[in-house]
Amino acid sequence: MDAIIRAKLNEIEHREQIRIIWAVEAGSRAWGFFSPNSDYDVRFIYIRDKKEYLRLEEIRDSIDAQQDDLLDIEGWDLRRVLRLVYRSTPEVHEWFASPTIYRSTPEGLELKKILPEYFSVKKCARNYLHTASLDFRTYFRDDEIWQVKYFYLLRQMLLAKWLLEDGSTPPMLFEELVRQKLDEQWKDYILELLGRKKASSELGKAPRNKKLIDYIEQSINRMDEEVSALKDEGKKSWELLNQYFYSVLE
């Protein structure tokens, strides 16, 4: 499959007249809770010819290259990515922590070195908790719950917990987050679900686990308060990102 994905990236470059500087696996396969029939979520960063960035009209800053049962391929323009780096958007940090890299270039590796300069515990944790709260309200009110949704919700919660407790970029693998940050009373239960997910196509629905859901809700609410109490880091300078962008376009 790696060869197929790399060939697809080459096709996209030719068709869109772009250059891809970074491409990774970014979904459940990178997080470690995929099943045999899970699709591949490929994300890439690309640049255009310098003249394209000098146009008066806005240029498209993303490419939805393919979406089917097997491949979900999407790319973001480098300028868009750099603006997200400035805001410490966790998704970009995850792309550079993925265990599966389909395309690596000197420009991509240089950007990876810059990321820590714009890393913010408060902004990243707030982002994860916001997503967790949305997922909680959307999927965890019914009497029966899709069991795989526990993984997505817990992942957001545990990423925030890692940030607040360790102050560093969290690991990508869900199992590592569970083993290091989930309360002991729930580890065996979640790891057993994870093993079943990896061995089968889907887990299906089950009656809502009220105790687990209460634990998750209380944890999210507590961490929301902790994040709000954190000091703002202050504004960062754009200069490092600007200089990097100029150098890539030369």
Language model segments and positions:
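Conserved nucleotidyltransferase catalytic core and NTase-mimicking acidic/glycine-rich helix/loop elements
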Residues: 113-237
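General structural signal for secondary-structure boundaries
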Residues: 1, 49, 77, 120, ...
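Glycogenin-like
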Residues: 82-121
